[in-house]
Amino acid sequence: MLRLPSSMPIVSFPANPNLLINPQPSWPSRRGNSAVVVSAASRDVDSFTSKSGYLFSLSADEADSLSEYNFPRIDGMYKKKPLILLRRLAQIGTTFSYWFGLRLADEALERSDQMFKVRAAELRKLLVELGPAYVKIAQAVSSRPDLIPPIYLDELSLLQDQITPFSTEVAFNMIEDELGLPIDELFSEISPEPVAAASLGQVYQARLRRSGKVVAVKVQRPGVRAAIALDTLILRYIAGLIKKAGRFNSDLEAVVDEWATSLFKEMDYLNEAQNGIKFRKLYGGIKDVLVPKMYTEYSTSKVLVMEWVEGQKLNEVNDLYLVEVGVYCSFNQLLEYGFYHADPHPGNFLRTYDGQLAYLDFGMMGDFRPELRDGFMEACLHLVNRDFKALAKDFVTLGLLPPTAEKSAVTKALTDVFQDAISRGVRNISFGDLLGDLGKTMYRFKFRIPPYFSLVIRSLAVLEGIAIGISPNYKVLGSTYPWIARKILTDSSPQLKSSLQNLLYEEGVFRIDRLESLLSESLRTETALVQKPVVGTESNIAMKQMLAFTFTEQGSFVREILLREFAKGLDAYGLATLDSFTFSGSGPSSSLTEEDMTNLRTFYRLISLFSGMQKAKSQVKAVSKYGEALTPLDEASLVMYQLPSAQEMLPILSILPELPQESQQRLLQLPGDLVGRLVTRAFARTIRRIFL
């Protein structure tokens, strides 16, 4: 499950599964032998047990019976044991007061710089002593190198999979109790010491006796359920006090409940096994993604057996390609299926030795409802296109703003806050910076943080943090937006189609610049996960990809828009051609309306778009620059003059045979479709001229 550290020797279990297996088990079973051999690393009592072991008195009965988070029940349990609650409050208070006191003393004595590393290490140790709830919070923070100093980052990163393990004797006894068989009947080999330890449990490497498969055996840490139950109770009390004081707009109690619900699900290893099975089914087929197999027949609520994966932690290798794979997989999780990994810290990813991205630990998962997924994509779309009025409505849809919020004031505030952030283009937008900018307006307009939102945002923020550790200039939104653009252009959701229609037709005017941007971004998905460059010129590759996309079933909605606008433009082109002969010697008169001129400019942009996007961008500026000073007929002549010549259109013709058969068949239907639309427009124009 986790990388086997080189410093951790495997005595009874060879790391290489091709090596010969020792037929005699090298561990004692308490059922067959009263002697117990404990590894040197496990002889020391871990600090969580040492400092917070008094919580175990509850773990033996009430806490272990909590199969899921239930605040009223937890509240009732601890009301019967007020001394434990008071002792925990005193422990938390004195622990943090002690550490902050040392920091203040360092500042007073002007030795902060010298003691910085020492205090970082002390903080890590104190968090471990307090238990898994605080470790989980620190793990999230440790994945953001842009938010905390490097020394603290290094220390807190150790919490991801290098926490002091608990006794192997206790772990082996738990395995036997949970699975109902002696260890030597379950495994032919098992490591005498854990190969990794985390906040909720620790992992052993083993080989199944029946099948000989190499597996990871995760065993739950004693007392975690009691500690998390009590700590979430305390956090909820604090959230309630803040709410009563009116110091926060969000329902903090609901946020704590959402987080606690996820933690309790994470402590149920049977639930984790089912999550892993579902995750493997949905995302295991993605290129270069590996999801280990779960062995549910060997798993219980406290013991989980899964396929062993060898590799290195993602933040230990400089592999930006795998980050892109992770971004694509996260896009699928959040916006395609809505079932997402809500705890993506570096310890839960591996780079396998054959270059795949392995996902580990499926305890904390989230569900993103379809209407929220669509709302999130719409918000990204409107943000990138600076449509802040629509963005304010999106925030209502997402539950961030109450429906009664003053939309015009919110729109102005969002414009002030985000205009600067997106001025450098979508590929340079920092997700972390956006969150920081958004925070400036949250209190003023009574923004709320829905319970689901905190997990989604944390997932994206942590993913960007991992990427920044590999590439400091990496922007997760810039890498995700091409997939969002493609999804918006191809999705059958009525909500997204309506949003796209409104974006492209602003007050009835077709915004081809926005379509160009969406198409350009969506085509980046074709090469995002390609390690070897595609052979061919950049313009030819772009044209081929654009045509292939437009003439597929998925591109039907965009194709309809393009055909509609192309027919308008072709109609305007015909009128302009007729005018050039009719009025060539009779002055500046023209039958072209302003709508015809707009359609003609759009026609030029469409032709240029499919014959070379760089040309479109450079030449339209010339039309715009001189258009206002020219008569309609002169401008029409200039546009017609700048249209690509037949020779310049030859690259498109050479690409057509390379398109998929499906696209070629739809292309053959194009002339008939266009003729029908042109006849309809000509008939409608004739009727208007007769009766109007």
Swiss-Prot record:
Name by which UniProt lists this protein: Uncharacterized aarF domain-containing protein kinase At1g71810, chloroplastic
Pfam families in the cross-refs: ABC1
InterPro entries: ABC1_dom, Kinase-like_dom_sf, Prot_kinase_dom, UbiB_kinase
EC number(s) on file: 2.7.-.-
PANTHER family for this protein: CHAPERONE-ACTIVITY OF BC1 COMPLEX CABC1 -RELATED, OS04G0640500 PROTEIN
Enzyme class: transferase
Keyword 4Fe-4S included in the entry's annotation: no
Transit peptide: 1-39
Domain (Protein kinase): residue spans on this chain: 189-523
Active-site positions on this chain: D343
Gene Ontology MF term list: ATP binding; protein kinase activity
Classification lineage: Eukaryota, Viridiplantae, Streptophyta, Embryophyta, Tracheophyta
Record's keyword annotation contains Transmembrane: no
Domain of life: Eukaryota
Binding site for ATP: V195, A196, A197, A198, S199, L200, G201, Q202, V203, K218
Keywords of this entry: ATP-binding, Chloroplast, Kinase, Nucleotide-binding, Plastid, Transferase, Transit peptide
